[in-house]
């Protein structure tokens, strides 16, 4: 099965892959951030949003993965094999979990549309040859003010209101009322 965990949120694994692996904070930092910002909503029995649900699932999945890694570490006799398993989990699974946690925390913090615009902006920036792109990559927290990505079908917002049309300078002609209609 080809399952993309970002599909229902308007993103793709490929879109997140444009961000380098060292872009994502450590799992510990992301878990601390999620706990500090969203602990009440994550622990609540109420459904808050699809991002909260996905974040809960990613946190639970990471916990189970750490339980498995501990079990393997304690039960695998060969140190070289143990090292291989730990490296695989940290490199591959760790990156996927860091991407998931970052995406859903960012969606909850900045809004899904802003995060998607950021991913597209970064993807365009990273694919542009260095000689032709700005020296600094887009920054998520400043994106709403500086984004150049526009949604299709909408005209850009104008900074000043458009001038109002002037009415004709000639006085309006009033219908003359007949004396009988004044009663």
From Swiss-Prot:
Positions of the UniProt region annotated as Disordered: 136-183
Residue segments, region RNA binding: 177-183
Residue numbers carrying Phosphoserine: 155, 162, 170
UniProt PTM: Phosphorylated by host SRPK1, SRPK2, and maybe protein kinase C or GAPDH. Phosphorylation is critical for pregenomic RNA packaging. Protein kinase C phosphorylation is stimulated by HBx protein and may play a role in transport of the viral genome to the nucleus at the late step during the viral replication cycle.
Function: Self assembles to form an icosahedral capsid. Most capsids appear to be large particles with an icosahedral symmetry of T=4 and consist of 240 copies of capsid protein, though a fraction forms smaller T=3 particles consisting of 180 capsid proteins. Entering capsids are transported along microtubules to the nucleus. Phosphorylation of the capsid is thought to induce exposure of nuclear localization signal in the C-terminal portion of the capsid protein that allows binding to the nuclear pore complex via the importin (karyopherin-) alpha and beta.
Listed transmembrane segments: none
Cellular component, GO annotation: host cell; host cell cytoplasm; T=4 icosahedral viral capsid
Record-stated family: Belongs to the orthohepadnavirus core antigen family.
Subcellular location per the Swiss-Prot or TrEMBL entry: Virion; Host cytoplasm
GO biological-process terms attached to the record: microtubule-dependent intracellular transport of viral material towards nucleus; symbiont entry into host cell; viral penetration into host nucleus
Gene name of this polypeptide: C
Protein name: Capsid protein
UniProt-listed InterPro entries: Hepatitis_core, Viral_capsid_core_dom_sf_HBV
Organism: Chimpanzee hepatitis B virus (isolate United Kingdom/LSH/1988) (HBVcpz)
Chain location of the short sequence motif Bipartite nuclear localization signal per the record: 158-175
Oligomer status and interactors: Homodimerizes, then multimerizes. Interacts with cytosol exposed regions of viral L glycoprotein present in the reticulum-to-Golgi compartment. Interacts with human FLNB. Phosphorylated form interacts with host importin alpha; this interaction depends on the exposure of the NLS, which itself depends upon genome maturation and/or phosphorylation of the capsid protein. Interacts with host NUP153.
Gene3D superfamilies reported in the protein's UniProt record: Viral capsid, core domain supefamily, Hepatitis B virus (1.10.4090.10)
Amino acid composition bias (Basic residues), ranges on this chain: 149-176
Gene Ontology MF: a single term: structural molecule activity
Annotated Pfam families: Hepatitis_core
SUPFAM superfamilies: Hepatitis B viral capsid (hbcag)
Sorted UniProt keywords: Capsid protein, Cytoplasmic inwards viral transport, DNA-binding, Host cytoplasm, Host-virus interaction, Microtubular inwards viral transport, Phosphoprotein, Repeat, RNA-binding, T=4 icosahedral capsid protein, Viral penetration into host nucleus, Virion, Virus entry into host cell
Spans of repeat Sequence: 155-161, 162-169, 170-177
Region 3 X 8 AA repeats of S-P-R-R-R-[PR]-S-Q, residue ranges: 155-177
